[in-house]
Amino acid sequence: MNPSRIRIKMCGMTRSEDIQCAIDLGVDAIGLIFYPKSARNVSLEKARIIVNNIPPFVDIVAVLVNPEQSFVQLIINEIPVQLLQFHGEESSEFCRQFNKPFIKAIHPKTAIQIQSAVDEFFDASAILLDTPSDKERGGTGLTFDWNIIPENLSKPYILAGGLNESNILEAITMCHPYAVDVCSGIEASPGVKDHLKMSRFIKAIWG
């Protein structure tokens, strides 16, 4: 995998200025978290405002954790999202009912868990691999054992979990993901991005 072609998603956006910085840096997607228990949660009202000036070819990803069907539909109706990202224990049937491209996040401890998710969520646009945690649904700042990722998965996968400017090149070289997802590794505090860290993260990948 050529690091220059790695796709990048920056997640947990809560401020317009952080989204604009991500756009200026050339990221492929930004993530909005619609989960009240998250420190990076955004309301529908705020989401409408901060996505207002996102140009074409920068995807908006709605990140959800075990949501009600009606809430997902409301987001689809109100926000111009290109992708849904399910970060809980949602079934494949639940994820596909919205007729919207989706990403299924899992928190694997074994290679078997990863392969099982690829098989179960066969119609997902990608599988996202994040760090297992009993306390947090992403944004832990911790990596997981990349050695468990099977080679030659039949589906594109997104690597997440504890990525930052110091380890991202090693992660890409070792894991060869289709894309990477960064959140806490580019923050000054939860939901507030550090623009210098954002720039350094991009430079570490693309040069």
UniProtKB/Swiss-Prot annotation:
Protein name per UniProt: N-(5'-phosphoribosyl)anthranilate isomerase
Family the entry assigns: Belongs to the TrpF family.
Organism whose genome encodes this protein: Legionella pneumophila (strain Corby)
Xref: Pfam families: PRAI
Keyword annotations from UniProtKB, A to Z: Amino-acid biosynthesis, Aromatic amino acid biosynthesis, Isomerase, Tryptophan biosynthesis
UniProt entry tagged with the keyword Translocase: no
GO biological process, one term: L-tryptophan biosynthetic process
Tagged with keyword rRNA-binding: no
Domain of life, per lineage: Bacteria
Pathways per UniProt: Amino-acid biosynthesis; L-tryptophan biosynthesis; L-tryptophan from chorismate: step 3/5
Catalytic activity: N-(5-phospho-beta-D-ribosyl)anthranilate = 1-(2-carboxyphenylamino)-1-deoxy-D-ribulose 5-phosphate
Annotated EC: 5.3.1.24
An MF annotation (GO) of this entry: phosphoribosylanthranilate isomerase activity
Leading EC class: isomerase
